[in-house]
Amino acid sequence: MTESEVSTPTVAPPVISLADNADTIKLYSKYIVPENTPFKTTDKQTLMDNCAFFAKMFVNLSAMAFSTLEPLDKKETKELSKKEKKQLKKEKKALKKENKGGKDKKDKKDKKDKKDKKDKKDKKDKGDKKDKKEKKEKKHDDDKSEVKEKKEKKEKEDRTIVEIRNTKSILDASSTSVSRFAPCMMFVNCPSGPAGLECRILKDTSIAKLKSEICWNQYLTNLVQCQERGLSKCFSKFVDLQKTCKQTEIPKKSFSLFDSLSY
């Protein structure tokens, strides 16, 4: 069998639980030692706490530094208010026209009914019955349309609310995720070759997770700000950012025993 016929075995990254368990800490403790970090402490727990503190700080500061939702300036606020007033005026005008049309129609009908009351009583009764039916059907259609509009609006609002809740749950787990080791692992120089494979996987995994949480925090901040402003389609505005956050969770490097030497 030639060398080219030998399949290249791929080494999957170690399964690292997001739970704060002894195995996870033990894995990272092998590489997070005082001589590998700039923190002036020899206590292992203090060292780990410092790593977690800086990881949390990076995530929190990212929301302020990289918010993609631009604040409304005075001109935009004025234009938004002007647009709302114009829409309100248009709606009032349409309502007034509708009421006037209904009144004119009623007056005309009353006049005709009075004139033909004596010899067209049966026809009038039939007309009244038809009008009543049409009015009832119109009310039903209006109610149905209103329910549909409210449902659509609620679904749009719910999508944003669901996204905010889901994103918060991702960030709530950050205190026990491998991202808390990233600030220390950034300073670790992993050995080259197969001997350093575990170290490089742990390092890349923790850094990718931290970058992901930074991204999710930016995403959450933008959704909340958008919702607080009362803007529409908040979820749709940041779909691309959501996709970026999902992609950031995956370490860029894929590992195999044969390419680890050139890593």
UniProtKB/Swiss-Prot annotation:
Transmembrane stretches, start-end: none
Keywords: Coiled coil
The name this protein goes by in its record: Uncharacterized protein DDB_G0288629
Basic and acidic residues: compositionally biased ranges: 96-107, 122-131, 139-158
Coiled-coil ranges from the UniProt annotation: 72-168
The keyword Transcription appears for this protein: no
Region (Disordered) residue spans: 76-158
Basic residues composition-biased segments: 83-95, 108-121
